[in-house]
Amino acid sequence: GFSADGLHAGFKKRKMDFGWIVSEKPASVAGVYTTNKVIAAPLIVTKTSVKKAGKMRAIVVNSGVANSCTGTQGLEDAYTMQEWTAEKLGVEPDMIGVASTGIIGELLPMDTLKNGLSKLVVNGNANDFAKAILTTDTATKTIAVTETFGRDVVTMAGVAKGSGMI
């Protein structure tokens, strides 16, 4: 199954701003990506891993700092975010997706990231993850549906952010 957690790490002044979704085992993954000419560092890292591995164990997300338009340092920081998360979960880096949302042009405060990562737990609070990925949104967007297929009971869940600025 999957679990999630979210917390306040310090990317923002007061609100939750860091979280992850973790799978017990490698899960098939696909991506839909921007067609913009400017592509943020976390997207480059995640897109590369999705193409290489086709499976992931987790995605880790910070909000408040987008790590977009940050050049070589931003890309290095996104790979470091992936590596640190992989180390914490005991998996290969390509099993980790990374995402950042927030202010464009700012580098990730890596001490804040490392401290926040040390506090994330597997089997944390999924609602806190939904709060942690918000930027200008006014409400969380989540859904879960359980269906029975023969003898198997399957729960599908989703969490999203966005449209607050549109």
How should each PLM-predicted stretch be described?
Residues 1-38:
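N-terminal amphipathic/basic leader segments beginning at the initiator methionine
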Residues 25, 48, 64-66, 101-103:
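Short, ordered loop/turn segments at secondary-structure junctions
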Residues 35-44, 72-80:
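Glycine-rich anion/phosphate-binding loops
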Residues 42-52:
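Short, charged beta->alpha transition segments
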Residues 44, 60, 155-158:
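Structured core elements
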Residues 57-64, 95-101:
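Glycine- and acidic-rich phosphate- and metal-coordinating loops
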Residues 60-89:
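Alpha-helical support elements that line or immediately flank enzyme active sites
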Residues 79-80, 84-166:
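Glycine-rich, mobile lid/loop segments that gate access to catalytic sites or pores
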